[in-house]
Amino acid sequence: QQYSEYLDTVDTAVFQQSPFHAKKFEHDGWTVEFIQASQEKEVYATCMLAYLPLMKVFKYCYVARGFLADYKDKDKLVKFTSSLRQYLKKKNVVYLETDPEIDLVQRDKDGNVVENCFHNYDVVDNLKLAGFLQLPLKQGYDLSKECRFCSSIDLRGKTSDEIFNAFSSATRRNTR
């Protein structure tokens, strides 16, 4: 309940971090729990942990689409992941995987990096500092993983026809 209420206050929350997605995990045999970290009664990080048993004794833990946290705040990120690591060790978790939904670099509709665009390479550096390893950024599909590249469209102030007509001809053809 507390987790759901917190999600309602965060702009960056995605479906994969929702209690609805937790129910899907549970239906598929995962054990799910929600944790949060706070400082002076202010929540600064939270996440949904999903566990699967490994070899009857150990566990694999997956944090779908990452923590709800400010990845640019290096100190709090390191503090949270350090506490999380200790917590998971007590639960016999031997592998933690996460795939945070972070806009790494701005790309155009063809997937090319936009010149003089925003980037979040510092976020990747902060996660590495917190002890995470980055898997290679590969294009293509891997059905065992969430997609690595996501596109988003700003829908504000546009009609459905304007949005649809801005798609490439192949995308328009495939969505009719």
Q: Which residues are covered by each model-predicted region?
A:
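Hydrophobic, Leu/Ile/Phe/Ala-enriched alpha-helical segments that form helix-helix packing faces
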Residues: L7-D11, L84-L88, L127
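Short alpha-helical segments and helix-capping/turn motifs at coil-helix boundaries
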Residues: P19-H21, F80-L84, Q134-K138
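Acyltransferase donor/substrate-recognition loop-hinge adjacent to the catalytic core
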Residues: Q1, A45, V123-R176
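Short amphipathic alpha-helix that is part of the acyltransferase structural core
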Residues: Q1-H21, R176
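Short aromatic/hydrophobic-glycine micro-motifs
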Residues: T12, W30, V93, L129-L133
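Extracellular disulfide-rich cysteine clusters
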Residues: V114, F118-N126
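Conserved donor-binding loop and adjoining core beta-sheet/short helix segment
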Residues: K23-E115
